[in-house]
Amino acid sequence: MNAPAILSRLLVSAVAVMSVLATMLPAFAQDKGTLDPKPLPPLTNPNDPHLAAKQLFGRKTLPTAGAPRVIGFYAKGCIAGAEELPITGPTWQVMRLSRNRNWAHPAMIALLERLSAKIHKDAGWPGLLIGDMAQPRGGPMITGHASHQVGLDADIWLTPMPNRLLSRNEREEMSAVMMVRKDRLDIDPHAWTPSHLAVIRDAAKEPSVERIFVNAAIKKALCREAKGDRSWLWKIRPMYGHDYHFHVRIKCPPGNPQCEHQTPPPDKEGCSARDFAYWFSDRVLHPKPPKVPPKPKPPITLAQLPADCRQVLAAPDAKQ
């Protein structure tokens, strides 16, 4: 087999593996929580240079004291001085409290509070159900996400908040509603409503929002149904999974020089057949596992994160 053919086969296998993994990971947010979360056991050798950084950050239950500071990239960084989104607000409720992932930069906290109030008015929802944001000090997570590391990402359920206070048990047990048809080619018309478009549109029109990740079938519906001003559609990016929630990512806040910016998405609607060709291809919708399973990718170590993340881990807890 010649070199181009080998390369082509490797690329196809890699895409298949990515498709399988990416469709599995978002399902984690649908996993049920517990009313009695057990603390993780102490690490035998926390200074082991080969230890996965997620084991260190996953054991921090409180943020650092001091001013908020974003360090690194969305998928490779941490945050100092994170703030906690109150678990219940006038127009939002936090889900899966046992995960302790309702922390973020104050800019994200302000966005969620403002956005939930706007959606209550524009979409008629009682409020938003908020999923994973970040850990108290950000960093890699033991389960679930590759990003959400610097306090600038948040998952919002596509299920309206009930018009009542959810119990702690309901917040651990309740599941979000699947928005995508079983064939993955379009939204489920029995679940999707015009209010869902209004919710995502309101989020996309926020100036601080840089990207919103949704399933390709949801992006397809938005392209089809959006009327009038469509200038916000370019922020909506198709992604594996994301079929019962959408993922909001905001820009690096001013005054955070250590925050690594992401290249903005192309300034176009992204609604052409060419834009959807990959996402609705057979290799993505029905990926075949490679004949030889790939070796697991080594986890990120503390040495691979920005140097200041070591200080974030060592800093004293903020007073509660």
What would you call each of these model-derived segments?
Residues 25-29:
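Sec/Tat signal peptide C-region and signal peptidase I cleavage site
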Residues 124-129, 150-154, 208, 242-246:
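Envelope-exposed proteins and targeting segments
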Residues 30-47, 166-320:
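Catalytic cores and adjacent binding grooves of peptidoglycan-active enzymes
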Residues 12-23:
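Bacterial N-terminal signal peptides
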Residues 59, 111-143, 213-235:
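Extended, low-complexity, intrinsically disordered C-terminal regulatory tails
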Residues 66-130, 192-202, 206-209:
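Active-site acidic/histidine clusters and adjacent loop/turn architecture
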Residues 2-14:
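Bacterial N-terminal signal peptides that target proteins for export
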Residues 33-68:
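Solvent-exposed N-terminal domain segments of exported/luminal and surface proteins
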